[in-house]
């Protein structure tokens, strides 16, 4: 049931050729006869190699790359006893290494060879399932600590030795999280780490001391590179640091005190859940710092009482797991799917969180040690214990076999014949520990893919049963639809006359019935011709009566019906979304309420059904994050993603934007947010995403080219200025982003630390191009934002990124008046504090430069008239809120003119970039009256509020000419006063 024999034989012949080439004195042509003789005898080294290469392409690759290792395996099959003493053996190899290049190669060669040995042991069943993931974890720990210790010595030579205020030498302590912490690592797991050190202080023994945090941050960066960087020898481990305090925005290394303060004051329940697995790697039990670190973390993880307060958080986590299974259709994912590894881990960790404070036996990291303890406490039955144990070991066997094939982090069942055969062969018989930790043979009735899948599903069903019973949900809102007039809506024999009767009963007027019946009949016809499966049809049959009952109970049923039917048609073949609406009545009600009031929301949900998930929590829906919470929410959203999957990362950014936009729109529609706050939220959302996009672009560009040599530490030397509505903190639902990219002045120089060296100027152009590419990339979730760069110096003819000096020179000497008007509505939206201050000084200097007031009036007036002529030709009976005279554009021009006219006398008048505060400051300084300022602000917010409302309805910003007549009249008076008197 593995690779066809001729293919294996050909692979062995190629390996034999390799041996003869590298070791002609030890191997000759007789080796080919040995292949013929022993290929079918798994007890011989050649037969064992046959089995190993048939099960793993990764093993084949390592044997080809490492001839000495191949020679060893040809003479003697690796055994589990050979997969031991990792730290000691690695230490010997690292002892003579003097350069980082040597460190990188040694780590990777050691890792690959030892992983290949474990894969061989796994393929030959010479190690149990448990022994494999324990050894994988021990190997990872040895590599991490070996690299840390080597780099620590080098760092001390470079920057001095870190000490505390009493002169005690400080070391970097590393918490291994997740499967690494629980001695449960997979073949191709990434590793989750947290760096910490005992106390603040500074280095000694260096001409230029640095503080401990800087030392350990630099050391941590070097360690991550040593483990994570991909070289010609591969990588050691994909390294994820996002579980540290404050995530990506937090310091890379924190002192013990800072760690304790964070977890006591800000630690969240999901961080408690994650920290259960946290284990100090390479811990010396005689080290007092090890004891201190454990003591400061324990109260955060384990409460001294039975912690029922966490149950709601666990319910939320459980709901998220269930929704993700539904939403993503994770049928063949053995980790994340229903009844998968994650659910077993969740079951165990629930009991640890709730009872671990009182039950010391639950304060462990290893799942297999915890299961019997949970049974002893009568928290699960003996049968449930066995069901979970056997399922876990079977699933972990499948997972490790899958990942050992190509050294890739996957939990998806294969679709190709070869890899299915490998799984069948690996799972019909293998070894695991008995109750006394002795190997025992496990056999399953697996002989083809169907029987494998049947065994897998049996395990998953047992896990799901325990998972579902663990934290119950009382669905008190479950509706009884037996009396629902729409119960038979999808029955083929329901006639139009009967539908008309139902509509009449529900108050639909006679003149509207034909139109509505036509829509309903078209929907029924569409459904009858769609292939949606048995389960899909069952769910739809239950859902439609509930949906129609609520639609026709709403006064806006005529508008609502086509919107809701469109959504249902879009999700018709995706049963998971139909189930979500059926099983969550509140979500259905919420969706109907929002779609009745917003075409935009209805369109977004129809295009991106993943947004339905946001409807499950009304409280969260009506309360968008506070402005400072946006980065943390986005980080939390991205945590579940593999760090090296850029496409998935970019798609997730778009999904986060859509989900948050939905929350803002919902709060707007339902009156929870005033118009000014809506724009604030939309602006801060855009800025949060912009920060993430720039950082992602920076990572991608620096991974290839390194970074400009003039930069220090974590500097980027790069600033993004927001113009227009972004600059004015006035974004709307459909606004694009007007951006200008600026960089440090670079007289010469190039990049360092990358695979390819380029000129520093070219680096920033590449960075700008990458940012634009990420924003505009079309994925299944749409694009992120439309980006407009035409306001940069020289417009479309200018470079995508220019220096601050070039920007200032252009604005001072070449910019037109309209470009200075645009500068009024600009502000720094990304960049280091020093660069933001620099931009603001340049901006203020330009806006406060002396200018001819008469010419300024002429320029502003002519530009407005030119714009009006360009947009003329519309219906005279309509008022375009944005473009027509007396509208938004006039108010914006008034604000810009006031700044340009009066900032030369008082530069403080140029401080604000938003119209409302510009009018406030002008009134404060007597430029306009308080009454004029209030009226201008009221006109502006009223017009913007109407535009927001029309956006939500999916309509253009056009109303009848009678609307806003007073506002238009007042704006015209101000315009005449400023530009014609």
Swiss-Prot record:
It comes from Mannheimia succiniciproducens (strain KCTC 0769BP / MBEL55E). GO terms for cellular component: cytosol. Keywords: ATP-binding, Magnesium, Multifunctional enzyme, Nucleotide-binding, Nucleotidyltransferase, Transferase. This is Bifunctional glutamine synthetase adenylyltransferase/adenylyl-removing enzyme. Involved in the regulation of glutamine synthetase GlnA, a key enzyme in the process to assimilate ammonia. When cellular nitrogen levels are high, the C-terminal adenylyl transferase (AT) inactivates GlnA by covalent transfer of an adenylyl group from ATP to specific tyrosine residue of GlnA, thus reducing its activity. Conversely, when nitrogen levels are low, the N-terminal adenylyl removase (AR) activates GlnA by removing the adenylyl group by phosphorolysis, increasing its activity. Signal peptide: none annotated. Its cofactor is Mg(2+). Its EC number is 2.7.7.89, 2.7.7.42. Residues 479-981 are annotated as: Adenylyl transferase. It is an enzyme of class 2 (transferase). The gene is glnE. NCBIfam families: PRK11072.1. InterPro entries: GlnE, GlnE_rpt_dom, NT_sf, PII_UdlTrfase/GS_AdlTrfase. It catalyses: [glutamine synthetase]-O(4)-(5'-adenylyl)-L-tyrosine + phosphate = [glutamine synthetase]-L-tyrosine + ADP; [glutamine synthetase]-L-tyrosine + ATP = [glutamine synthetase]-O(4)-(5'-adenylyl)-L-tyrosine + diphosphate. Transmembrane segments: none annotated.
């Amino acid at each position: 049931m593995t690779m066809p024999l001729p293919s294996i034989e050909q692979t062995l012949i190629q390996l034999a050729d390799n041996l003869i080439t590298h070791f002609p004195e030890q191997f000759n042509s007789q080796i080919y006869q040995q292949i013929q003789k022993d290929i079918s005898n798994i007890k011989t080294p050649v037969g064992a190699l046959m089995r190993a290469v048939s099960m793993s392409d990764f093993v084949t690759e390592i044997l080809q790359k490492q001839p000495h290792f191949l020679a060893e395996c040809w003479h003697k099959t690796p055994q589990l006893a050979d997969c031991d003493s990792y730290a000691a053996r690695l230490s010997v190899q690292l002892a003579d290494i003097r350069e980082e290049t040597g460190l990188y190669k040694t780590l990777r060669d050691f890792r690959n060879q030892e992983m290949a040995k474990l894969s061989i042991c796994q393929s030959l069943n010479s190690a149990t399932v448990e022994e494999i993931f324990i050894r994988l974890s021990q190997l990872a720990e040895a590599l991490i600590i070996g690299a840390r210790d080597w780099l620590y010595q080098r760092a001390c030579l470079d920057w001095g030795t870190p000490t505390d205020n009493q002169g005690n030498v400080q070391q970097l302590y590393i918490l291994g999280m997740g499967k690494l912490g629980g001695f449960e690592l997979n073949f191709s797991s990434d590793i989750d780490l947290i760096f910490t050190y005992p106390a603040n202080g500074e280095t000694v023994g260096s001409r230029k001391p640095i503080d401990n945090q800087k030392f350990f941050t630099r050391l941590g960066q070097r360690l991550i590179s040593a483990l994570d960087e991909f070289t010609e020898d591969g990588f050691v481990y994909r390294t994820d640091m996002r579980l540290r305090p404050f995530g990506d925005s937090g310091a890379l290394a924190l002192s013990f005190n800072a760690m304790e303060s964070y977890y006591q004051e800000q630690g969240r329940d999901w961080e408690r859940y994650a920290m259960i697995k946290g284990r100090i790697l390479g811990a010396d039990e005689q080290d007092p710092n090890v004891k201190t670190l454990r003591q400061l973390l324990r109260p955060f993880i384990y409460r001294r009482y039975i912690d029922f307060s966490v149950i709601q958080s666990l319910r939320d986590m459980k709901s998220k797991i269930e929704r993700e299974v539904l939403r993503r259709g994770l049928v063949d994912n053995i980790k994340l799917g229903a009844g998968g590894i994650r659910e077993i881990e969740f079951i165990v960790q629930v009991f640890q969180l709730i009872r671990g404070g009182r039950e010391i036996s639950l304060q462990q990291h290893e799942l297999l040690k915890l299961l019997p303890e949970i049974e002893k406490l009568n928290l699960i039955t003996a049968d449930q214990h066995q069901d979970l144990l056997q399922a876990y070991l079977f699933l972990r066997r499948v997972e490790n076999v899958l990942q050992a094939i190509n050294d890739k982090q996957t939990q998806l069942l294969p679709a190709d014949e070869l890899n299915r055969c490998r799984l069948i062969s690996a799972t019909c018989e293998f070894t695991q520990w008995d109750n006394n930790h002795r190997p025992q043979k496990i056999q399953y009735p697996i002989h083809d893919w169907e029987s494998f899948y049947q065994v897998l599903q049996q395990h998953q069903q047992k896990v799901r049963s325990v998972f579902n019973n663990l934290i119950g949900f009382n669905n008190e809102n479950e509706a009884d639809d037996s009396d629902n007039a729409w119960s038979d809506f999808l029955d083929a024999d329901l006639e139009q006359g009967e539908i008309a009767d139902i509509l009449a009963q529900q108050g639909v007027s006679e003149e509207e019935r034909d139109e509505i019946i036509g829509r309903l009949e078209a929907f029924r016809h569409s459904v009858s011709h769609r292939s949606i499966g048995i389960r899909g049809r069952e769910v739809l049959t239950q859902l439609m009566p509930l949906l129609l009952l609520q639609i026709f109970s709403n006064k806006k049923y005529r508008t609502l019906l086509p919107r809701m039917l469109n959504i249902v048609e879009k999700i018709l073949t995706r049963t998971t979304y139909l189930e979500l609406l059926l099983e969550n009545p509140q979500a259905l009600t919420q969706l109907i309420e929002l779609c009745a009031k917003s075409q935009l929301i209805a369109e977004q949900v129809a295009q991106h059904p993943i947004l339905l998930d946001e409807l499950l929590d009304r409280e969260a829906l009506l309360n968008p994050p506070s402005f400072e919470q946006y980065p943390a929410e986005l980080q939390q959203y991205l945590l579940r993603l593999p760090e090296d999957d850029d496409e998935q990362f970019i798609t997730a950014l778009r999904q986060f934007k859509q989900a948050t936009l939905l929350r803002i729109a919902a709060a707007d529609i339902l009156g929870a947010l005033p118009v000014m706050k809506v724009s604030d939220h939309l602006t801060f959302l855009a800025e949060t995403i912009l920060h993430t996009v720039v950082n992602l672009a920076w990572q991608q560009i620096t991974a290839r080219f390194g970074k400009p040599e003039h930069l220090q530490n974590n500097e980027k030397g790069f600033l993004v200025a927001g113009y227009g509505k972004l600059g004015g903190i006035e974004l709307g639902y459909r606004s694009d982003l007007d951006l200008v990219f600026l960089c440090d002045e670079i007289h010469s120089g190039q990049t360092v630390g990358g695979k390819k060296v380029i000129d520093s100027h070219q680096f920033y152009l590449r960075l700008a191009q990458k940012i634009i590419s990420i924003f505009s990339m079309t994925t299944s979730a749409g694009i992120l934002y439309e980006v407009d760069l035409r306001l940069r110096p020289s417009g479309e003819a200018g470079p995508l990124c220019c220096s601050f000096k070039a920007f200032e020179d252009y604005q001072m000497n070449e910019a037109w008046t309209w470009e200075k008007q645009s500068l009024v509505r600009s502000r720094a939206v990304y960049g280091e504090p020093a660069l933001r201050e620099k931009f603001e000084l340049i901006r203020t200097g330009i806006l406060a430069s002396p200018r001819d007031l008469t010419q300024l009036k002429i320029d502003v007036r002519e530009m407005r008239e030119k714009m009006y002529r360009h947009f003329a030709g519309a219906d005279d009976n309509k008022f375009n809120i944005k473009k027509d005279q007396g509208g938004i554009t006039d108010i914006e021009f008034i604000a810009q003119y006031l700044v340009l006219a009066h900032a030369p006398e008082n530069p403080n008048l140029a401080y604000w970039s938003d119209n409302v505060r510009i009018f406030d400051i002008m009134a404060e300084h007597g430029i306009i009256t308080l009454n004029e300022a209030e009226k201008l602000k009221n006109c502006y917010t009223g017009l913007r509020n109407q535009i927001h409302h029309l956006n939500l309805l999916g309509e253009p910003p056009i109303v009848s000419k009678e609307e806003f007549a007073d506002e238009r009249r007042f704006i015209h008076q101000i315009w005449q006063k400023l530009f014609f008197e």
